[in-house]
Amino acid sequence: MKKQLDQLTAYTPGLSPESLKKQYGIKGELHKLASNENVYGPSPKVKTAIQSHLDELYYYPESGSPKLREAISQQLNVDASRILFGAGLDEVILMISRAVLSPGDKIITSESTFGQYYHNAIVESADVIQVPLKDGGFDLDGMLQQIDNKTSLIWLCNPNNPTGTYFSHDELFNFLKRVPSDIPVLIDEAYVEFVTADDFPDTLKLQEDFDNAFLLRTFSKAYGLAGLRVGYVIASEDAIEKWNIIRPPFNVTRISEYAAIAALEDQEYLKEVTQKNSFERDKFYQIPQSQHFLPSQANFVFVKTSRSQALYDALLNVGCITRLFPNGVRITIGLPEQNNKMIEVLKHFEY
């Protein structure tokens, strides 16, 4: 057994509504707003696509998801040979880490970001440098100072999970200019569809100038397919060719591929979802207590408090399950009535 596994624990999902009801003695309805899921669900066309292909379940998937790859290639205007799929971004991160990292290599990322960058690096016996956040966001200058000849991967998350903060196009451009061209920079844009900031990076455009800038996206968030597990990376052809060696041959299911294609094609529904999210997100920042909230470009709000357990409990008491952190609570943007209840709690909470 790998000794480095002693440094890790298995992922612990949040308690189910049923478990929390029993633990806290809650009798009313509980809403799961802890995992940044799209509360509006996927496009209705997804259900139609799934139902129309149920008679294919006894077939293996087409390896590499060629239909979906071509659909994304057409929509984003990138060569299909530069796209690789995983069963969610979790698997994409695992494949890249496994393909690139050797014992003694180093990755650079941030504190308080998506945990799978750290987790998979430790599994591969790599060292992890976690640069503290600056004003709730990635400290890109601080990360540059950590680069040395052992650095093999740099992981960025934009907007960042769990804080919702982002760095701009110019900030990313200036960062990439200063990173040695042989070090891959992985830019995780899982929440990009929710972004409304005008200066958010056009990462696809930046890839034209920086061969080491690799982009990760997912169907789990805005597209509402978290239960079907489809994520992908857009990178250089050489990198994709190598990483594809690591990919399990049938990792994305046949049904997942059809569902993702249907979701991708319904851009009008996606626009409706993201507009609703933006409207509801803004409501949180219209109250005076928003001084305690980190500015978010995602479908969640991070609330800073030294009394995070008390805030978690207060939100639970109005029927909303959120995500507890030592320094705050992350609230997934819910339906209007759920958000209104949480905002009332936030208005009267002593931070």
Swiss-Prot record:
Identify the cofactor(s).
pyridoxal 5'-phosphate
**Keyword Transcription among record annotations:** no
Q: Which reaction does it catalyse?
A: L-histidinol phosphate + 2-oxoglutarate = 3-(imidazol-4-yl)-2-oxopropyl phosphate + L-glutamate
Q: What class of enzyme is it?
A: transferase
Record key words, sorted: Amino-acid biosynthesis, Aminotransferase, Histidine biosynthesis, Pyridoxal phosphate, Transferase
Q: In which pathway does it act?
A: Amino-acid biosynthesis; L-histidine biosynthesis; L-histidine from 5-phospho-alpha-D-ribose 1-diphosphate: step 7/9
Q: Which GO terms describe its biological process?
A: L-histidine biosynthetic process
Which residues are modified to N6-(pyridoxal phosphate)lysine? K221
Q: Which GO terms describe its molecular function?
A: histidinol-phosphate transaminase activity; pyridoxal phosphate binding
Pfam families noted in UniProt: Aminotran_1_2
Q: What is its EC number?
A: 2.6.1.9
NCBIfam families reported in the protein's UniProt record: hisC (TIGR01141)
Protein family according to the UniProt entry: Belongs to the class-II pyridoxal-phosphate-dependent aminotransferase family. Histidinol-phosphate aminotransferase subfamily.
Please give the name of this protein.
Answer: Histidinol-phosphate aminotransferase
Q: Which organism is it from?
A: Staphylococcus epidermidis (strain ATCC 35984 / DSM 28319 / BCRC 17069 / CCUG 31568 / BM 3577 / RP62A)
Q: What is the lineage of its organism?
A: Bacteria, Bacillati, Bacillota, Bacilli, Bacillales
Tell me what gene encodes this: hisC
